[in-house]
């Protein structure tokens, strides 16, 4: 998913991980 794509990015992971 799309979420996986964001997780790949450390910067975006902060938002994605927090949301997830």
From Swiss-Prot:
Expressed by the venom gland. Residues 3-20 form the LCN-type CS-alpha/beta domain. GO terms for molecular function: sodium channel inhibitor activity; toxin activity. InterPro entries: LCN-type_CS_alpha_beta_dom (IPR044062), Scorpion_toxinL/defensin (IPR002061). Keywords: Amidation, Disulfide bond, Ion channel impairing toxin, Neurotoxin, Secreted, Toxin, Voltage-gated sodium channel impairing toxin. It is found in: Secreted. The record marks 6 as: Important for toxin potency but not for selectivity for individual Nav channel subtype (Nav1.6/SCN8A and Nav1.7/SCN9A). A motif (Important for toxin selectivity for individual Nav channel subtype (Nav1.6/SCN8A and Nav1.7/SCN9A), but not for toxin potency) lies at residues 9-11. Pfam families: Toxin_3 (PF00537). GO terms for cellular component: extracellular region. Alpha toxins bind voltage-independently at site-3 of sodium channels and inhibit the inactivation of the activated channels. The fraction to which this protein belongs exhibits low toxicity and induces transient paralysis in all insects tested (the crickets A.domesticus). Belongs to the long (4 C-C) scorpion toxin superfamily. Sodium channel inhibitor family. Alpha subfamily. Has the structural arrangement of an alpha-helix connected to antiparallel beta-sheets by disulfide bonds (CS-alpha/beta). This is Toxin Bl-3. It comes from Buthacus leptochelys (Egyptian fat-tailed scorpion). The lineage of its organism: Eukaryota, Metazoa, Ecdysozoa, Arthropoda, Chelicerata.
């Amino acid at each position: 998913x799309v979420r996986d794509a964001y997780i790949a990015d450390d910067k975006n992971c902060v938002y994605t991980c927090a949301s997830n």
